[in-house]
Amino acid sequence: MKGRYPIDRQFGIWAKFTPSLSRGFLRLAAFFLPLMPKGLSDRRVNVTRVTFEKGGKALLIAAADCAENAPCLVCFHGGGFVFDAARYHYENAKRYALMAGCKVLFVRYPLAPGNPWPAPNDACLAAYRHALSHARELGIDAEKVAVGGDSAGGFLAADVALRAPEAGLPPPCFAMLIYPVIGGEETPSMHRFTDTPMWNARLNAKMWEYYAAGNQVILPGSRDLRAFPASYVETAEFDCLHDEGARFAERLAAAG
């Protein structure tokens, strides 16, 4: 039942909001989200538009005083593979740039249901490839390029980390996975959190319907993880994704 979870008051109205995944709502979101303020009009940061192959677009976000040849985080936003980035995604990217002393390549990838698997994954791998091949132009250190993302973005970050060596690319130096989508198995948290606000198991099932579109998606948890980069994995308390993220972290630890 909604409201039975002791969610912190700092979440405000979002503690009571659950999005629709109807195609009509997705069309509205696709129109309005890009028009929303991004919180990047800040003299502390410089923002540059970047385009690359596979239909991808990105923003390079860096502190105004960021040195050249800086580390870089290639960042993939969440949104269930169907929603564009929200303001808090951009604000988090800005925080990473300001607080970690790195540049952030914030990627906007093609969205389902119009662009199901593997289109988002291919665009994200292309963004990572672009960061490496254009490192000097972007002012980043090609040996210090990490990947990261939240929710669906965490899935895409893990996918890039696994596919990069297969594509003849150096692996990321690090992976930051924030309450990542992993998939592949039924978990207690998926059965328990069917009515949580913002995201729940019912929405998650619909997400997979749109993203997979009848294809057999290659999941991060089904892969050999022995070459996976050093990682940070975060899970959320009242989250249907909790257990799959925790189990993926356990598998990473076991793989060394």
Where are these regions (language model features)?
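A glycine/proline-hinged amphipathic helix-loop "lid/cap" segment
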Residues: 1-65
